[in-house]
């Protein structure tokens, strides 16, 4: 069994420090509910002394979490900060005070203006002071990534002896290389007495784009808590992305000797929730949760994925709550991808015709970055409009109005010359016409989409109706019809879709 790696989420504290990403208490509670749904181990709910809003957030999230997660309030190594955090956490069942100070030469000389000895004294004092309120005290050695290793070990030794239960080793500026950061954690494990009895946490930033690699290097060398945020939100270039470390541990748990209890199927939902609340858009190519994370546009890749998802996807989209793989059609797409998408839209062509269809597709793709469904439908419209009519709509007559029950009478001929005249009522003239058509045809499709657009100008414009129906096997079939009368257009489109459905069924049966 691999080690349990605790996920410490700081979206509501460090993540909120992203410019423009601030959240009010109600929004923080919504995010906290999602974190609890994901089974995150620790939630850093805020910095209580910084504002009344942060104080209330820590208080409310402490109540909300119950026994399901540790709730953390951040402080400086200052008594009044710790007092305020303890007050905010008084309702939490599993409270933790997170206190500390800088330990790098830059922080000691330029920010704190204290000596190493004074730093050690403050570290001991803040831990002891926090222990008066709670048993669970986490100490952060800010900017540990640039600290002298010997001095860092001295500080960590001192706070463990003072009663710290968690020691947080941040690379606050994202400065370190992964191997060097891992060696730093290993040095602590080798040289600090009693460190095996506390939790070693890593808090890494993304200034050089290596936050996830740094965090995993820490885990490889003894850390058992990762501090991270949804979507990698945070100061400057952000923090370690929760979704990235969780999935890395899922994929490489044996190598890293670690696993998490996070419900990975909630990752995409969490990403979208935080993006919506903060207004911080997720880049399309963001690992795990980006819009393009499971999108394929290269023809070679598309062909491979269509044959077997595992050829180019190491993660099943369902495992992170994503809708599924997506084939992006462009000039780089091949025959397989085009045929697959056309099939999904309800279009099929024999081999003898498909090369012509593909060449027309390339002409369109050369003019556009991405070819959408509407482009494909327009592309095949001329060919498919002339589809052999199994049923032909001869006429439609409707009666409707404020005082009338909508009624449609359709006249349809079939492929063997039979004539059918049927009348039906409905909730409107189009519904009545569709019910009448259903009584005539031999198959039935459920209407999924109905769209109308004018394809010419003026009050006598021709209206084009596009419908999509779903057959019993789940396949989509598209139909189009145009006329100056929108009810006639609608009926034509429906019959067109029905004809396509029947043709495809017959083709499968070899008829």
From Swiss-Prot:
Domain Pyruvate carboxyltransferase span(s) in chain numbering: 5-268
GO MF, one example: manganese ion binding
EC primary class: transferase
Cofactor(s) named in the record: Mn(2+)
Catalytic activity: 3-methyl-2-oxobutanoate + acetyl-CoA + H2O = (2S)-2-isopropylmalate + CoA + H(+)
Any one Pfam family match given in the protein's UniProt record, by short name: HMGL-like
Region called Regulatory domain, residue ranges: 392-511
InterPro entries per record: 2-IPM_HCS-like, 2-isopropylmalate_synth_dimer, AIPM/Hcit_synth_CS, Aldolase_TIM, LeuA/HCS_post-cat, LeuA_allosteric_dom_sf, LeuA_bact_synth, PYR_CT
Pathway named in the protein's UniProt entry: Amino-acid biosynthesis; L-leucine biosynthesis; L-leucine from 3-methyl-2-oxobutanoate: step 1/4
Biological processes annotated in GO: L-leucine biosynthetic process
Residues covered by region (Disordered): 1-23
Disulfide pairings: none
The entry's keywords: Amino-acid biosynthesis, Branched-chain amino acid biosynthesis, Cytoplasm, Leucine biosynthesis, Manganese, Metal-binding, Transferase
NCBIfam families: leuA_bact (TIGR00973), PRK00915.1-3 (NF002086)
Family: Belongs to the alpha-IPM synthase/homocitrate synthase family. LeuA type 1 subfamily.
The protein's name in its UniProt record: 2-isopropylmalate synthase
Organism name: Olsenella uli (strain ATCC 49627 / DSM 7084 / CCUG 31166 / CIP 109912 / JCM 12494 / LMG 11480 / NCIMB 702895 / VPI D76D-27C)
